[in-house]
Amino acid sequence: MITFIIVLLVLVGGYFLYGSYVERVFGPDKIRKTPALTMADGVDFIPLPTWKIFMIQFLNIAGLGPIFGAIMGAKFGTASYLWIVLGTIFAGAVHDYLSGMLSIRHDGESLPEIIGRYLGLPTKQLMRGFTVVLMILVGAVFVAGPAGLLAKLTPEYMDVTFWIIVVFVYYMLATLLPVDKIIGKIYPLFAIALLFMAVGILVMLLWNHPALPEITDGLHNTHPAGLPIFPIMFVSIACGAISGFHATQSPLMARCMKNEKYGRPIFYGAMVTEGIVALIWAAAATCFFHQNGMEESNASIIVDSITKEWLGTIGGLLAVLGVIAAPITSGDTALRSARLIVADFMHLEQKSIAKRLLICIPIFAVTIGILLYSQRDAAGFDMIWRYFAWCNQALSVFTLWAVTVFLVRAKKNYYITLFPALFMTAVCSTYICIAPEGLALSDYVSYIIGGLCTLVAAIGFVSWYRKQNSIVYEKI
């Protein structure tokens, strides 16, 4: 329990200390007008209250990640605590903050456009296709799951098909309508419910004072299947430490902020909050595994068991609400992000409903196609979905390298993103080699390949960096 309390305090302290330092490195301009004010269109560029933006950003980036990912990551032992804390402070929150602030500086541009500015046109084109496919995949996946749960809670005539239609109609409305009409109204409520559930679990942890692993016991790998901590744990716990998906969501809120000074509490703060939620659930899962063994691999069952046992009936209701609402609120903003990404590279203004429909109809059609495929061939789709975890972290690699280039050109401390970029390069390159859904190579060979990929990236950066001294860049 001592280790848990210490790392929890370190996480909070990281927001005030390292978060403040990262903010100074970027240098927010409190006088500069934001896109929400200069480009207001009543649809995507709408000034919103800061507290509401924080809640929306938190729910956008959270979803089920800090709960399910942390629970599965807890099987690796105390190392999961360290990754959540250090990953959040030095990688995830930095990644979210700087990508969000760059979006503000570049008129609310979506992630592929930002990456393209700093990594070149070929990378921009790759990221345009990559992120749109990723967003549509997320949107499709997070329809059937919640629909199945809702079908179990409602009368027989409200079957899975009925709820799939209801959820998808909601997705269509949330993707098309102005951000303040649906997302701005219901997201804060769902975010409060998710936070309330986490706070309740934290109170019970402190009250019951269960035996939790301490760092003094060592960082032994306790995973029942013997999966290696590196790189598997660093991909399993994504949203609770660093996730590329977050950078696709930050531009949504970058278009609603009224002042750059709110960037740290919104972008860095939302990520730290998510890290706290992940840490709480990792500790709770540790208690569950200690009492029931590690055979259970269904995170939904673990969440249901913990909340009902610790929080009673209300906790059970919150668990159901969270497990249903979290994926839905990830799916709708994923499709909204897809619309904005396409609008950016096609240079289509989105004030007109006709222009929005022009983009959304193909997106909805592809999403429905993927959804139907997932229902007909669950095994085949499951294999596709397994790659999401790797693709998600690969996206964070591109984002970190792009931000590193920005910091170099702006003559700022680029080490704050260079080291995370190198580390995540090692994680992703090793994971795709070692994972069963990847090349399924031996640990030894995978580590060598991962190390070589990281070395090549480092050498490439040093070579590029040496050419930068003679180049003068504009200040953004």
Language-model regions: role of each:
Residues 2-19, 73-103, 112, 315-316, ...:
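Extracellular loop-to-transmembrane helix junctions
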Residues 5, 9-27, 130, 146-150, ...:
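Membrane-interface loop-to-helix entry segments
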Residues 10-67, 259-262:
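Membrane-interface "cap" regions at the ends of multi-pass membrane proteins
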Residues 11, 15, 91-107, 111-176, ...:
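Helix-loop-helix module between adjacent transmembrane segments
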Residues 49-65, 202-210, 218-281, 321-330:
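Hydrophobic, membrane-embedded alpha-helices of multi-pass small-molecule transporters
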Residues 65-71, 107, 134-147, 237-257, ...:
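Membrane-helix boundary/coupling elements in multi-pass transport proteins
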Residues 139-165, 174-175, 194-221, 406-414, ...:
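Hydrophobic alpha-helical segments and their helix-loop junctions in multi-pass secondary transporters
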Residues 205-215, 268-305, 375-379:
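Extracellular/periplasmic helix-exit of transmembrane alpha-helices
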